Amino acid sequence: IWLTALKFLGKNLGKHLAKQQLAKL
């Protein structure tokens, strides 16, 4: 359960950070 939860959070964080990086450009 924890591994899948961490993977899910990791994907969401990746998308969020990617959006922030695109916004800066």
Swiss-Prot record:
Principal location class:
secreted
Residues annotated as signal peptide: none
A Gene Ontology cellular-component term: extracellular region
* Residues with Leucine amide modification: L25
| Cell location | Secreted
Q: In which tissues is it expressed?
A: Expressed by the venom gland.
Biological role: Has antimicrobial activity against Gram-positive bacterium S.aureus (MIC=3.79 uM), Gram-negative bacterium E.coli (MIC=7.81 uM) and yeasts C.krusei (MIC=26.3 uM) and C.neoformans (MIC=13.2 uM). Has hemolytic activity against rabbit erythrocytes. Forms pores in lipid bilayers in vitro; pore formation is reduced when cholesterol is present in the bilayers.
Give the family per the record.
Belongs to the cationic peptide 04 (cupiennin) family. 05 subfamily.
Q: What is this protein called?
A: Toxin LyeTx 1
Q: Which organism is it from?
A: Lycosa erythrognatha
